UniProtKB/Swiss-Prot annotation:
GO molecular function, one term: DNA binding
Span list, region Disordered: 357-420
Biased composition (Basic and acidic residues): 398-420
Name of the protein described by the UniProt record: DNA repair protein RAD52 homolog
Coiled coil: none
Functional description taken from the UniProt entry: Involved in double-stranded break repair. Plays a central role in genetic recombination and DNA repair by promoting the annealing of complementary single-stranded DNA and by stimulation of the RAD51 recombinase.
PANTHER family assigned to the protein according to its UniProt record, in alphabetical order: DNA REPAIR AND RECOMBINATION PROTEIN RAD52, RAD59 (PTHR12132), DNA REPAIR PROTEIN RAD52 HOMOLOG (PTHR12132:SF1)
Pfam families for this protein: Rad52_Rad22 (PF04098)
Sites bearing Phosphoserine, chain numbering: S200
Cellular component terms per the entry's GO annotation: nucleus; protein-containing complex; protein-DNA complex
GO BP, sorted A to Z: cellular response to oxidative stress; DNA damage response; DNA double-strand break processing involved in repair via single-strand annealing; DNA recombinase assembly; DNA recombination; double-strand break repair via homologous recombination; regulation of nucleotide-excision repair
Entry's localization field: Nucleus
Species the sequence originates in: Mus musculus (Mouse)
Subunit comment: The full-length protein forms heptameric rings. Interacts with ABL1. Interacts with RPA2; the interaction is direct and associates RAD52 with the RPA complex. Interacts with RAD51AP1.
Length: 420
């Protein structure tokens, strides 16, 4: 049964579902009648004959009795019916997988549960071993199957002697060896299945359908919902039995289709997002490529900045030093072969000249030495020390210019007195 239907039935206070106004019991909820119970109990008390028991040699030379798996399944079908019992594997563990000289050794344990149609069950553990195979997959397959078969036989053994519990009685096994074995029955080849079509089953199914059509569907009966008790003021709200089963089936189908549809939508959405991301990355690459090309072309067109052997700042500092400390002052004096006297320098400084004459001479001095003030930096403001140095240089130059005519007259007088 599907999961949604089981959840619906569990939520309805464990009431069985209704089909055509009749309750339908699930597996594990059916009850044996008294006759069935007595017949099954009598059959399970019987002990198995030597025809059902096999033996093999175990480790250490000991003889071990067991029942083959297919015989146990046939016995369970005879006792409970083919649809009266079921088994399930609740847990399976791989204990070890060893590789030795190219051969695999595997051990697996499995827990198997056998349940009858009335809900009673037995559960036991089985173990399977595979040794010496060179294929790992085949070793695991053999060990798993052996573990499940062993667990199934041990679980069925708990129901009674007829399903294998009698082989644990060693006294019975000793006495069993005294019984002669019956000759196996000849196989009737006429009863073997040779065709795909089974006429007896088809005829029984057809008769069942015709019987249902002859009886007709029962009239829909108005019943209250089994999921909740109807209050007094809602007593007129009733549900139809036929609609219950159809709604449950439609609910299960809808849930399954919705889950499948959601998975498809998720996959489609993921593909769309991936495609959108790829397109965005491609557009970014295309947009970055032209920008880089334009930048490269622009860099190629622009001229390279001029490379000066002497930095501008160094040149300006050199000019400033030349302005503050003029080197051509002594060269001009040496060209005239004149040596300045201390008295000639001090005398003009001691004379008191009018302001107009000093201003005129200062202007002439500035004209004779034009490079002193023209090469100064306009941005730099000279400090007080710089102004004092410039004023001192101007006074020295002015006194020398004033003393030059006086020296010339003295030289002429000396030449006249000394004819040689």
């Amino acid at each position: 049964m599907a999961g949604p239907e089981e959840a619906v039935h569990r939520g309805c206070d464990n009431h069985p579902p209704f089909v055509g106004g009749k309750s339908v019991l699930l597996f594990g909820q059916s009850q044996y009648t008294a006759d069935e119970y007595q017949a099954i109990q009598k059959a399970l008390r019987q002990r198995l004959g030597p025809e059902y028991i096999s033996s093999r040699m175990a480790g250490g030379g000991q003889k071990v009795c067991y029942i083959e798996g297919h015989r146990v399944i046939n016995l369970a079908n005879e006792m409970f019916g083919y649809n009266g019992w079921a088994h399930s594997i609740t847990q399976q563990n791989v204990d070890f997988v060893d590789l030795n000289n190219g051969k695999f050794y595997v051990g697996v344990c499995a827990f198997v549960k056998v349940q009858l149609k009335d809900g009673s069950y037995h559960e036991d553990v089985g173990y399977g071993v595979s040794e010496g195979l060179r294929s790992k997959a085949l070793s695991l397959e053999k060990a798993r199957k052996e573990a499940v078969t062993d667990g199934l036989k041990r679980a069925l053994r708990s129901f009674g002697n007829a399903l294998g519990n009698c082989i644990l009685d060693k006294d019975y096994l000793r006495s069993l060896n005294k019984l002669p074995r019956q000759l196996p029955l000849d196989v009737d080849l006429t009863k073997t299945k040779r065709e795909d079509f089974e006429p007896s089953v088809e005829q029984a199914r057809y008769n069942s359908c015709r019987q249902n059509e002859a009886l007709g569907l029962p009239k829909p009966q108005e019943v209250t919902s089994p999921c909740r008790s109807s209050p007094p003021h809602d007593s007129n709200i009733k549900l139809q039995g036929a609609k219950d089963i159809s709604s449950s089936c439609s609910l299960a189908a809808t849930l399954e289709s919705d889950a499948t549809h959601q998975r498809k939508l998720r996959k489609l959405r993921q593909k769309q997002l991936q495609q959108q991301f790829r397109e965005q990355m491609e557009t970014r690459r295309q947009s970055h490529a032209p920008a880089e090309e334009v930048a490269a072309k622009h860099a190629a067109v622009l001229p390279a900045p001029p490379k000066h052997s002497t930095p501008v700042t160094a040149a300006s500092e050199l000019l400033q030093e030349k302005v503050v400390f003029p080197d051509n002052l002594e060269e001009n004096l040496e060209m005239w072969d004149l040596t300045p006297d201390l008295e000639d320098i001090i005398k003009p400084l001691c004379r008191a000249e009018p302001a107009q004459t000093s201003a005129t001479r200062t202007f002439n001095n500035q004209d004779s030495v034009p490079h002193i003030h023209c090469h100064q930096k306009p941005q730099e403001k000279p400090g007080p020390g710089h102004l004092q140095t410039c004023n001192t240089n101007q006074h020295v130059l002015g006194s020398r210019e004033d003393s030059e005519p006086h020296r010339k007259s003295q030289d002429l007088k000396k030449r006249k007195l000394d004819p040689s």
